[in-house]
């Protein structure tokens, strides 16, 4: 064996191996590496997009929460206002009812006073008649002296 032949055959085998590797092995490896780089780049871009979307969603949720709080405070204010109106309406209604009851009671008292005065007038007229009868020692006829009794009632 000649060392030159061995060296040349090894160099040719190495050259064939390099050619085979460059021709058939290297392109799929490069495609796999490029695909992996694309996947990583897309993942990073998606992560950035997700981060931006998360920030936007956080802002939107904050806006929604603020709006909901504002609406809630508006609703509470309206409810308090309506409650105050209802209380005022109830006070007015109660005052009107009290006034109506007071007017009715005053009218009833006036009627009772009038009735009591009438009863008192009749009793006084009866007493006056009895007193006059005792003074005159005779009985006074009510029919005959109706005019006298009417004027006596009017004076009382």
UniProtKB/Swiss-Prot annotation:
Q: Would the keyword DNA-binding be found if you checked this record's keyword annotation?
A: no
User: What topology does the record note for this protein and the membrane?
Assistant: Single-pass membrane protein
- Membrane spanning residue stretches: 5-27
Query: Would you tell me the Gene Ontology cellular component terms?
Result: plasma membrane; proton-transporting ATP synthase complex
Q: Name one Pfam family in it.
A: ATP-synt_B
Q: Which domain of life is it from?
A: Bacteria
Q: Where in the cell is it found?
A: Cell inner membrane
- Principal localization? membrane
The record's note on quaternary structure and interaction partners says:
F-type ATPases have 2 components, F(1) - the catalytic core - and F(0) - the membrane proton channel. F(1) has five subunits: alpha(3), beta(3), gamma(1), delta(1), epsilon(1). F(0) has three main subunits: a(1), b(2) and c(10-14). The alpha and beta chains form an alternating ring which encloses part of the gamma chain. F(1) is attached to F(0) by a central stalk formed by the gamma and epsilon chains, while a peripheral stalk is formed by the delta and b chains.
Q: What is the name of the protein in this document?
A: ATP synthase subunit b 1
Query: What gene makes this protein?
Result: atpF1
């Amino acid at each position: 064996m000649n060392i030159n032949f061995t060296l040349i055959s090894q160099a040719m085998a190495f050259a064939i191996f390099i050619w085979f590797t460059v021709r058939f092995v290297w392109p799929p490896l490069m495609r796999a590496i490029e695909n992996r780089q694309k996947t990583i780049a897309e993942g990073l871009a998606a992560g950035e997009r997700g981060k931006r979307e998360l920030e936007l969603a956080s802002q939107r949720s904050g806006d929604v929460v603020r709006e909901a709080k504002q609406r809630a405070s508006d609703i509470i204010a309206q409810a308090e206002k309506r409650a105050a109106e209802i209380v005022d309406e109830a006070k007015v209604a109660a005052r009107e009812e009290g006034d109506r009851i007071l007017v009715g009671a005053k009218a009833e008292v006036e009627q009772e006073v009038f009735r009591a005065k009438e009863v008192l007038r009749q009793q006084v007229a009866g007493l006056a008649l009895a007193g006059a009868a005792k003074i005159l020692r005779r009985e006074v006829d009510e029919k005959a002296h109706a005019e006298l009794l009417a004027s006596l009632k009017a004076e009382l």
